UniProtKB/Swiss-Prot annotation:
Entry membrane topology: Multi-pass membrane protein
Protein name: MFS transporter PfmaC
Null mutant phenotype: Does not affect the production of scytalone.
Disulfide links within the chain: none
Functional summary from the UniProt entry: MFS transporter; part of the gene cluster that mediates the biosynthesis of dihydroxynaphthalene (DHN)-melanin, a bluish-green pigment forming a dark layer in the conidial wall that protects the conidia from UV radiations.
Keyword Cytoplasm: no
Bias (Low complexity): 59-69
Pfam families (alphabetical): MFS_1
Record GO biological process: melanin biosynthetic process
Family to which the UniProt record says this protein belongs: Belongs to the major facilitator superfamily. Allantoate permease family.
Native source species: Pestalotiopsis fici (strain W106-1 / CGMCC3.15140)
Induction record: Expression is positively regulazed by the cluster-specific transcription factor pfmaF.
One term of GO molecular function: transmembrane transporter activity
């Protein structure tokens, strides 16, 4: 509530004993709870309908919500300029509980997705007699098949089942399958377990991205999405550090090789995170029963998303699919994510690991540790692009700039016969690829915010289609038996072509299409009103 409004309320409630509470709010006293201020302003409404409106919409906050898009503050700001202290407190709670669990869950997801590569390079290949076949590629393939099947349906389920039950349940289920891999002796056993890991992991990225979009404003999303995805980068990096440490200190303990211990430790790390999510994940604003949110904060959370044009979830019927498949967003963003997947950017850390192993110049701990530098570049790029895209209020220019960097790195991969140190530097620089995921996810949340079911389905469909197209592409162009140069299959030149297509589509195509469709929507609205 603004200062003048609170002063009027204070004057009107002097006889009701509410002045101390409202006066404290005027001073910006953060110790006054939202419930107290809400109760005070509600008391005003007993004799004044105008005050009732004021109390319902501006209690403990500013009367005008921060506008979506960029503000006038500095480049690096966590809250939009003009955000009230009470709303900042709400956002802090969301960051502390919602965002923290999201990051931890995605950390485990990426840890579990990358562990098989670290295990493969740390003795699993030799102990189980893998190679010169494509066992590692097939492990990736079965994982992707599971994600293709699981992601869209998981994200539709999350619109009717409380996320705080669904997401931790999926986390525990896929972690149980990860644990099972420590007993595997054949490639077929790995394939089965990797399929089920992918099936339940498919709920993580689209489900959490959907839930974040239910709580945060459009102008807040890119920064949070970037932090969320960066946690996955840390998961990839930590997998290398953990495998290196286990190889040094646990190899042979309990009769188990170090690569088997990796799967056991990954499961142990997942258990407390799943329990944390069960008790602290806040569901969605219209359904939340989070113990750490007071009544005013729950109302404010609903008001925040309503002001962004987002509606409560409707019933799930055929009309939902009609809305989805007649929209431009489903095709534009699914194509964008498919092109990103076909760059095989998410596998470059794996190929870097195999490259280091092929040189025969590095120890097992070094082979696991050095590729994490790629993750560090990924981390910094996500943070930077998140802030920049929020500041300028556009995703296209950022995608175009990052795409130009990727065109350079993939050109070096295509040439290949370059000095060893240059090739290593290019592998590391290629870490910029990862920022596309939060940029595209934030873009979807921005464009589809008014229709939560469409938004949820598109996020899931992006994951599934991305996995579907990369399965045959990875098998044909990037078989592990041809790693790391992939000369016979022309892997790197093929990926370069998709990098160029990705850069043009996300940097130029989607922004032009978005502007055209928004103008058309305004014309249709004007004609309808006429």
């Amino acid at each position: 509530m603004s200062g003048p409004a609170l002063e009027v309320a204070a004057a009107k409630t002097a006889e009701q004993g509410q002045v101390p509470v409202l006066a404290a709010a005027v001073r910006g006293d953060t110790k006054v709870s939202g419930d107290s201020i809400h109760a005070a302003t509600t008391a005003v409404s007993d004799g004044d309908n105008q005050s009732s409106t004021m109390s319902g919409k501006t209690a403990a906050g500013d009367a005008t919500s921060p506008a979506s898009g960029s503000g006038s503050g500095g480049w690096f700001h966590w809250h939009e300029p003009g955000t009230s202290k009470a709303e900042k407190k709400l956002i802090f709670k969301l960051d502390w509980f919602l965002l923290s669990y999201s990051c931890l869950c995605f950390f485990i997801k990426q840890l579990d997705g990358n562990n098989v590569t670290n295990a493969y390079a740390s003795g699993m290949q030799e102990q189980l007699g893998f190679g010169p076949g494509n066992e590692l590629s097939w492990m990736n393939t079965y994982f992707n098949i599971g994600q293709i099947i699981g992601a869209p349906f998981a994200n539709m389920i999350i619109t009717v089942v409380r996320p705080r039950y669904w997401l931790p349940a999926c986390l525990m289920t896929w972690s149980a399958f990860v644990l099972g891999m420590y007993r595997c002796e054949t490639a077929a056993q790995f394939y089965v377990l990797r399929f089920f890991i992918g099936l339940f992991e498919g709920a993580a990225w689209p489900g959490i991205t959907y839930t974040l979009g239910c709580w945060y404003r459009k102008s807040e999303m890119a920064r949070r999405s970037a932090l969320f995805v960066m946690s996955g980068v840390l998961g990839q990096m930590f997998s290398g550090y953990l495998q290196a440490a286990l190889y040094t200190g646990m190899d042979g303990k309990g009769g188990l090789a170090a690569w088997r211990w990796l799967f056991i430790f990954d499961f142990i790390l997942a258990v407390p995170i799943a329990i944390y999510g069960l008790f602290c994940f806040p569901d969605t604003p219209h359904k939340t029963s989070a113990w750490y949110l007071n009544s005013w904060e729950r109302e404010k959370a609903v008001e925040r998303i309503d002001s962004e044009g987002r509606k409560p979830i409707g019933k799930l019927d055929l009309s939902v699919f009609k809305r989805i498949f007649t929209s431009w967003q489903v095709y534009a963003f699914t194509l964008g994510y498919a092109l990103w997947s076909l760059t095989v950017g998410s596998y470059v850390m794996q190929y870097f690991t195999l490259y280091l192993k092929a040189t025969k110049e590095y120890t097992i701990p070094q082979i696991n540790n050095i590729p994490t530098a790629l993750g560090a570049v990924n981390f910094v790029t996500m943070l930077t692009t998140g802030f920049v895209s929020d500041k300028i209020g556009r995703r296209g220019p950022v995608c175009l700039a990052v795409g130009c960097v990727l065109i350079f790195t993939y050109s070096i991969f295509t040439a290949w016969n370059v000095p060893h140190r240059l090739l290593m530097a290019v592998f590391i620089l290629n870490g910029v690829y990862g920022c596309y995921t939060p940029l595209l996810a934030g873009w979807v949340n921005e464009c589809c915010g008014g229709d939560q079911q469409k938004r949820a389905f598109i996020l899931g469909l992006m994951t599934s289609v991305g996995g579907a197209v990369v399965i045959p592409f990875q098998q044909l162009q990037f078989p592990s038996s041809q790693a790391p140069q992939f000369k016979q299959t022309h892997g790197w030149p093929s990926a370069l072509a998709f990098v160029i297509a990705l850069t043009c589509w996300t940097g130029l195509g989607i922004p032009l299409l978005q502007r055209r469709m928004e103008k058309q929507a305004k014309r249709n609205e004007a004609e309808h009103e006429a």
